[in-house]
Amino acid sequence: GVTLRTVSIAAAVRQHFQDIGHDEKVTDVTYENAQARERTQVLMDIANQQNGIVVGTGDLSELALGWATYNGDHMSMYGVNGSIPKTLVRYLVRHAADTCGDEALAAVLYDILDTPVSPELLPAEEDGTIAQKTEDLVGPYELHDFFLYHFIRYGCPPRKILHLAELAFAGRYDRAAILKWLRTFFRRFFQQQFKRSCLPDGPKVGSVTL
């Protein structure tokens, strides 16, 4: 089983903001990344206490886009999801919900699927909903996973990937939207390579990995 433990990072992060002279009302990248790194520090230290390891949760899609805080959620002792794209994660969660035979567990899993993907490093909206939605910022993961597969598995150039995506997603995304997120994909893929150059080990599950 799993033991649930909540450790507040609020006091530690606020103290850190004071130490470096950062106004906590300024919700910029420093505000976000300080929280992500504090989370990781807590996990690493508890792992030391328990003589255990920190299991990373970052997936292949996040690694491709560099959508992780360097030395924050980017780091662990073992990255179990490192070769699993986010679209597959969703399929696996839905399959577990559909077949688990436990109504309470299934309800939780379906709720997870209905919740927008988010690192939740910014304050919530006034109505309590998530303000920071990853796919609003970097684009739909189903597109990025499509781009990644054809780029890494087959070495397709951007022009061919654009053509294939137009065929595969006809009626769902127009050419302008696909081109916008394709440019985002390639820009981030190469720009964020430095994060992939120092990743923890992880298993290779499918035919595409980084």
Named regions from a protein language model:
Residues 1-210:
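ATP/NTP-dependent adenylation/nucleotidyl-transfer catalytic domains that generate, transfer
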